[in-house]
């Protein structure tokens, strides 16, 4: 009888310990962009690493129609992590465009905690139009597909056009039809972009089969105006597009994407997350080339990402701790570190 009671007590104790251990695991439903997107693919790779190395957390990847849906989802309590870009943070802070009127619905403030890669946007025209469309301002009055309405790439290019005073006519088209519409004259231009200055989107590759498009670079004066307006500018090699783009360089405007969590994840845990990512970045890059930029210089990339958004959203204290340790922190950002 005593042995039976002892066995039951031991079994109960084990069950209680198991239940206690289970309760210590914090669920992180992490919003990202749609299945098949670079953001969805990258988060799957990242979540696998973090779930293995940080067992107190359980990350589940939650695809959404677009990255801004994940930002809004975090702010309203639907997600604990999100896929956020500097252009989205700009719109949120300024109560404009896709975030117009959204602040009234917010339950918590998004913060920046990890920057992962850039996306670089620009413009393309048909090669036959190179003689008459020579810079971005020449697109005024023209029919332009700058991307699907909710997408960050569209928002960034539209913002750049606005800074230059480009009064184009936006055309919403199916991605699969963009090339044929450009070829047939249904549109005069469409957006082109790269990811981490290394690859392009499948739909742009498909459009290349239907239309002989040429990269349309902003003029030197336009580049100067864009820089003055706060845009970063980069030159990408044409061979990224794996076709003749009829220019010897492609001038694009990068913006920064990150996988972010809020203050619900403590400073020390975000710091550990960042150090784990840095330690395992070679394996991450092998699984997804989108991590190549942080493989080259993770601390420097965090500095650039923070600089892109420091005026729009606060900085997670765990990211600040990591950056201070790596010597890439700017003391003028001290007041922008998030506090509960």
PLM regions and their residue ranges:
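Extracytoplasmic small-molecule ligand-binding "clamshell" domains
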Residues: 42-76, 245-247, 340
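Sec/Tat signal peptide C-region and signal peptidase I cleavage site
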Residues: 17-23
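Ligand-binding clefts/hinges and TM-proximal coupling segments of bilobed small-molecule sensing domains
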Residues: 134-135, 141-159, 230-299
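An extracytoplasmic/periplasmic, membrane-proximal ligand-sensing/linker region
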Residues: 177, 194-215, 225-227, 268-340
